């Protein structure tokens, strides 16, 4: 015969199990998103990617009805951020704004990759392009790419270029290779500290994204000589292209939203739709354009195909520049 206390314990346990089941079911059926989303960035605060992402994410959070928490994880050419997101739960609450650095260039720059740029991620939406530009310390007596090349050839090994991303590394190495220059490479963890040393005159030049470098150019702390894209930048129409002097030079930095592999399709569809709505707003396009970003987006499938294409593009760039894996 079961005692009363045992019966009560059994009933309580049964009730607890039923309650837990109901809670679990309710949680599973809760509409996405039901809590804040963490958005991981592979670069430090103050970088071009950070500045443009904060504009987009503020509006995205309003549209989704939750907070978007920006988490900057610079280091190892963006690998720290990419690895963190790749290992996160595919529930839509840990996302990443990536660029060509972690997802296009690193596989050909790093010997020990800690993630697969395709298999470990779910493409959500491309968010645009960020042109890079060549900037130099104002004390360097050159006002064009041709004049800078002449100076560097006159004194081989004297001039250096800083880098805070894979795009900057590849741009500098491509410049040296195509122009036949002996330049010292000085790598940094991210662009802001590299920029600080360039302004202080501790390095000679740098390829930097327009949003990060433009304020310093406008303040006369740096001189801008050219943009890295095939076409001139709408924001800096007076700047020539690198290709105008160094034939074959064409490097663009892209941005896009990704999550861990195997994210539910309905969550990806929702995020993609809201991101694209943000980009359709003229005020947002204007804010991003003022920071040097050409904003546009498309379906997840289009972004997935683009990611694979960019691996081919950056493999060619890196091999052409003669850069070996480190």
Annotate the PLM regions:
Residues 1-6:
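N-terminal secretory signal peptides that target proteins for export/translocation
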Residues 34-36, 178, 218, 265-326:
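An extracytoplasmic/periplasmic, membrane-proximal ligand-sensing/linker region
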Residues 51, 55, 59, 80, ...:
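Extracytoplasmic/secreted proteins, especially bacterial periplasmic and envelope-associated proteins
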Residues 10-22:
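Bacterial N-terminal signal peptides
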């Amino acid at each position: 015969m079961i005692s009363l206390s045992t019966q009560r314990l059994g009933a309580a346990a049964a009730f607890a199990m039923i309650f837990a089941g109901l809670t679990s079911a309710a949680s599973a059926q809760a509409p996405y998103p039901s809590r804040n989303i963490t958005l991981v960035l592979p670069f430090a605060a103050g970088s071009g990617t950070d500045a443009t992402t904060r504009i987009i994410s503020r509006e995205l959070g309003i549209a989704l009805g939750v907070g978007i928490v920006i988490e900057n994880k610079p280091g190892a050419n963006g690998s720290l951020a990419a690895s963190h997101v790749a290992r996160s739960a595919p529930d839509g609450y840990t996302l990443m704004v990536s660029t060509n650095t972690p997802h296009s260039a690193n596989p050909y720059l790093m010997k020990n990759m800690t993630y697969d740029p395709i298999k470990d991620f779910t493409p959500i939406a491309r968010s645009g392009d960020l042109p890079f530009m060549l900037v130099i310390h104002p004390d360097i007596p050159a006002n064009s790419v041709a004049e800078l090349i002449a100076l560097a050839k006159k004194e081989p090994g004297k001039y250096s270029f800083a880098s805070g991303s894979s795009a900057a590394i590849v741009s500098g190495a491509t410049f040296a290779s195509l122009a036949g220059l002996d330049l010292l490479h000085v790598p940094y963890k991210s662009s802001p500290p590299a920029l600080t040393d360039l302004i202080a005159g501790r390095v000679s030049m740098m390829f930097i994204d327009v949003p990060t470098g433009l304020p310093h150019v406008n303040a006369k702390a740096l001189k801008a000589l050219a943009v890295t894209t095939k076409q001139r930048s709408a924001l800096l129409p007076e700047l020539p292209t690198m290709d105008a002097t160094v034939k074959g030079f064409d490097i663009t930095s892209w941005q896009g939203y990704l999550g861990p592999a195997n994210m539910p399709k309905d969550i990806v569809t929702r995020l993609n739709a809201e991101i694209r709505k943000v980009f359709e707003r003229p005020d947002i396009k204007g804010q991003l354009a003022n920071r040097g970003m050409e904003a546009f987006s498309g379906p997840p499938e289009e972004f997935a195909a683009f990611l694979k294409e960019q691996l081919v593009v950056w493999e060619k760039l890196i091999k052409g520049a003669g850069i070996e894996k480190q």
